[in-house]
Amino acid sequence: MRQKRKGDLSPAELMMLTIGDVIKQLVEAHEQGKDVDLNKMKTKTAAKYGLASQPRLVDIIAAVPPHYRKILIPKLKAKPVRTASGIAVVAVMCKPHRCPHISFTGNICIYCPGGPDSDFEYSTQSYTGYEPTSMRAIRARYDPFLQTRHRIEQLKQLGHSVDKVEFIVMGGTFMALPEEYRDYFIRSLHDALSGHTSNNIHEAIKYSERSFTKCVGITIETRPDYCMKRHLSDMLTYGCTRLEIGVQSVYEDVARDTNRGHTVKAACESFHLAKDSGFKVVTHMMPDLPNVGLERDIEQFIEFFENPAFRPDGLKLYPTLVIRGTGLYELWKSGRYRSYSPSDLIELVARILALVPPWTRVYRVQRDIPMPLVSSGVEHGNLRELAFARMKDLGIQCRDVRTREVGIQEIHHRVRPYQVELVRRDYVANGGWETFLSYEDPDQDILIGLLRLRKCSEETFRFELGGGVSIVRELHVYGSVVPVSSRDPTKFQHQGFGMLLMEEAERIAREEHGSGKMAVISGVGTRNYYRKIGYRLQGPYMVKMLK
């Protein structure tokens, strides 16, 4: 049979040849120890076969032969930063609902877009519906099961490991929704991982524990006034391990003028209660709010990181954006509000990042809202990178957890740790003694793993934590995702750092805190790890009596 010439081939056949050629070049480059620019390779190869468009990354990944997958998939992985911290994050959105404080303040926060009464009516509160997570949620009609399944499949196609998943529940104040809906939503997340259809939360969690894809944590976005004792107890039942609390400003006058509907004092109380329950606390903060100014903005972040009433474990920094349909938009239109200039904003963010202590992680530096929807505010999509460049000019450093993570360092700087040692930092926060233990390479300032230990204060309301108990609020070894039951000598997960951190934490709890019991707030999927080292389940915590 006569072989077809290139001119006789269909576009689909030419695309198959292009993909095969790209894979062949990648294999050759690997065997010769060369680094390649995948985008240039795809463009050049597509042109060679007369194609106007490049082959899609998912198609190249799908076509990699089985015996080359282990070698090539890490090189092909789209946005490797997504799983560089060792966990695949799956963001899901609850259904659109009104903000809870409308009933007593009469309106939403002045800068808040989205929600059922906004110009973006099919979006959730504080989102426009055009963010990537919002669009995925709308396509799934806000069904939590479908959102999870679709996102996990998408991450797999892009070459990411999804053996360990952390959920982020977004879309306004989740804890203000009816209990029946909340139970259904969380149950669906666990069922999407296990494949089992559960009748209640406890059944869903039981099956999720044994799932191949482990739920290592759930993060819930909330407000300080929906972070009280009953809310915290419900969230513990769900398997939640981290809270994202919207604070926005440490100034009471700013909270009042922006119609937040809660006080800063309430935020401090919620931090105390949350940490005494074992939660990791991440806060949302907004520089450039009305009636603040550059000087007050810098002062509030000094207060935020130095005052023991705040001192969060993580930060999402969201510079104020002016978006159509908000109260702030009307102030801006009438000339009563002006955003910082781009250079002032970069300078401010650089100064804020320099203040961040080494035990705090900066998760984000700007919102995901598409620029065409922004009337005034951030003008650059790469604000973090511009702030880092400014810091370099000023001779100052950002030493937050994310910047120093081993996985991030390897991706951005091709740097691996050489001399690893245990580092201990103690500080007081929210009425308790905190110890931040980490394995680091001090010379290169690279972080391999961390543990957050807290001596619970006497005000803790959970009976499991009363009477002299220390609690591990976080244990995390960084580096690319490695399945829970396997080892990879080139990765840092599952090499024993977690066990060493736990041993040191138990020693501190026993000898320095004088605690008779150690508790761990553990993701549902990691409970078996703690069972192997002598812990048992008590309520939502894994606990162990200390000799």
From Swiss-Prot:
Similarity section: Belongs to the ELP3 family.
Pathway where it operates: tRNA modification; 5-methoxycarbonylmethyl-2-thiouridine-tRNA biosynthesis
Origin species: Mus musculus (Mouse)
Keyword Zinc-finger: no
Biological process (GO), any one: positive regulation of cell migration
Modified residues (Phosphoserine): 161
CDD domains recorded: Radical_SAM
Regions crossing the membrane: none
Protein name (database record): Elongator complex protein 3
NCBIfam families for this protein: ELP3
Residues bound to acetyl-CoA: 164, 474-477, 497-499, 530
Domain (N-acetyltransferase) ranges: 396-547
Domain of life: Eukaryota
EC number: 2.3.1.311
SUPFAM superfamilies to which the protein is assigned, alphabetical: Acyl-CoA N-acyltransferases (Nat), Radical SAM enzymes
Gene Ontology MF terms: 4 iron, 4 sulfur cluster binding; metal ion binding; phosphorylase kinase regulator activity; tRNA binding; tRNA uridine(34) acetyltransferase activity
